[in-house]
């Protein structure tokens, strides 16, 4: 198996091996239209970095290697149509700790140079069997789901054998995060139709009606129904949805990490990491890639009331990977910006409209307004599967309203008078004009041009 398939890396966009020897590798990258960064035809640096990363993987020649780039320099611009050769050589070898020097050339001109280090060598299998942080595993006739309501103090796995159990888990937020919900629903469809032999329309409607805002849910179920009608193997289709999401997250991480300055203090909201996706993450995936890329970042983690996805889940992921961070109350963010203690904000998305409005966890709009007031860049990271081109404006999005009890009770303890009512909106809408850019696996787009990310 190609190492890129093993790790969920896009094979077409990371180049083709032309020479592999012990401790050395060369990769040829033929640039194409989809790699454009702007109207001038320049190639986004993330694709050069991806080819360099792949060359370093081949040079190290370990099936389960993960590398981090450091001292990276983009020396000359690359245009669509240019052919780039990336040459990687292992310069230091101390067992599991290796250093790889990579240089990329356009003809005789050096366009990129950098160092790559093995961060960890782990048993990481695709469709498999084991992964560092992963919210679910498909086991053929059942879905194993990490119950995120129990984190960070307990790691409890639910064994779901029916589509009704999957629907309940989605509705009650045992799983959350738009991409993870989409993947989970796809496997729920497999359980209902293939394992339980239930009516497909009934299964579809039950799963669809669990959460009204997350577009990945509808996107995944529509794709599963289409696959069924076309006579495809729906189990393989669900696996493909999972694989594509992980691959998209890795690309987003590579592309998005370029906008993160060295020594940056990054603020993020809710949980947008591996727990919210098929692995790696969207906004937190960008942060993760910047960390492993040697950016020496620090993360401010919004606690994200009332469900505390930031304090419970994002912090849990950051602790697991030793990424420096501090948890803050949601109301602290504005003061930190005023004091110059936030360099940029990166959040995820549950739905993106055709004009670039974004539905995301409640509190996102507040952060965007604060960023505009304090001149702090505000980025959204999401896969193209989150873009709903059928909806033009955020005003058309249904905002989920959840139980008031989730506001009045925290950690099992009542924190408000039982006679008091509460309003619990799960999401808000951030208008396109407040967003600096939207990071996708296809590149970084201005909000008003986001539908271009859907073009082949």
From Swiss-Prot:
Lineage of source species: Bacteria, Pseudomonadati, Aquificota, Aquificia, Aquificales
Alphabetized Gene3D superfamilies for the sequence: Hotdog Thioesterase, translation initiation factor eif-2b, domain 1, Translation initiation factor eif-2b, domain 2
Organism (species): Aquifex aeolicus (strain VF5)
Enzyme class: isomerase
Protein name: Methylthioribose-1-phosphate isomerase
Catalytic residues (UniProt): 350
EC number(s) from the headed UniProt entry: 5.3.1.23
Record field: catalytic activity: 5-(methylsulfanyl)-alpha-D-ribose 1-phosphate = 5-(methylsulfanyl)-D-ribulose 1-phosphate
Keywords on record: Amino-acid biosynthesis, Isomerase, Methionine biosynthesis
């Amino acid at each position: 198996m190609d190492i890129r398939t093993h790790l969920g890396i896009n094979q077409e966009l990371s180049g083709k091996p032309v020479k592999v020897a012990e401790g050395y590798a060369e990769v040829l990258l033929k640039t194409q239209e989809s790699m454009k960064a702007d109207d001038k035809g320049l190639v986004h640096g993330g694709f050069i970095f991806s080819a360099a990363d792949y060359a370093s993987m081949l040079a190290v020649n370990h099936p389960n290697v993960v590398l981090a780039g450091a001292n990276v320099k983009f020396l000359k611009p690359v245009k669509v149509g240019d052919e780039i050769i990336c040459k990687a050589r292992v310069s230091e070898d101390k067992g599991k700790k290796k250093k790889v020097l990579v240089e990329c050339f356009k003809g005789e001109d050096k366009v990129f140079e950098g160092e790559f280090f093995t961060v960890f060598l782990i048993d990481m299998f695709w469709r498999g069997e084991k992964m560092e942080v992963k919210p679910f595993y498909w086991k053929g006739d059942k879905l194993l789901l990490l119950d995120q309501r129990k984190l960070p103090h307990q790691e409890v796995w639910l064994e779901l054998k029916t589509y009704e159990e999957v629907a309940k888990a989605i509705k009650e937020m045992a799983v959350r995060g738009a991409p993870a919900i989409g993947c989970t629903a796809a496997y729920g469809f497999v359980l209902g139709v293939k394992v339980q032999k239930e009516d497909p329309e009934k299964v579809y409607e039950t799963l669809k009606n669990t959460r009204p805002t997350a577009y990945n849910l509808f996107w995944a179920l529509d794709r599963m129904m289409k696959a069924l009608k076309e006579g495809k193997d729906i189990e393989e289709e669900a696996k493909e949805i999972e694989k594509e999401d992980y691959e998209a997250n890795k690309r987003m991480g590579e592309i998005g990490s370029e906008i993160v300055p060295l020594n940056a203090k990054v603020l993020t909201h809710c949980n947008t990491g591996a727990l919210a996706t098929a692995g790696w993450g969207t906004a937190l995936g960008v942060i993760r890639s910047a960390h492993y890329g040697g950016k020496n970042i620090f993360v401010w983690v919004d606690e994200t009331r009332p469900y505390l996805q930031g304090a419970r889940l994002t912090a849990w992921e950051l602790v697991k990977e030793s990424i420096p961070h501090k948890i803050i109350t949601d109301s602290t963010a504005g003061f930190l910006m005023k004091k110059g203690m936030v360099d940029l904000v990166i959040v995820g998305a549950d739905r993106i409209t055709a004009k670039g409005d974004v539905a995301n966890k409640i509190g996102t709009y507040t952060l965007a307004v604060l960023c505009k007031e304090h001149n702090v860049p505000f980025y959204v990271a999401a896969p193209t599967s989150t873009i709903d081109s059928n909806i033009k404006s955020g005003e058309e999005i249904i905002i989920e309203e959840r139980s008031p009890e989730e506001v009045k009770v925290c950690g099992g303890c009542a924190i408000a008078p039982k006679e008091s009512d509460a309003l619990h909106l799960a999401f808000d809408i951030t208008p396109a004009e407040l967003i600096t850019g939207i990071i996708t696996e296809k590149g970084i787009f201005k909000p008003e041009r986001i539908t271009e990310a859907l073009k082949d």
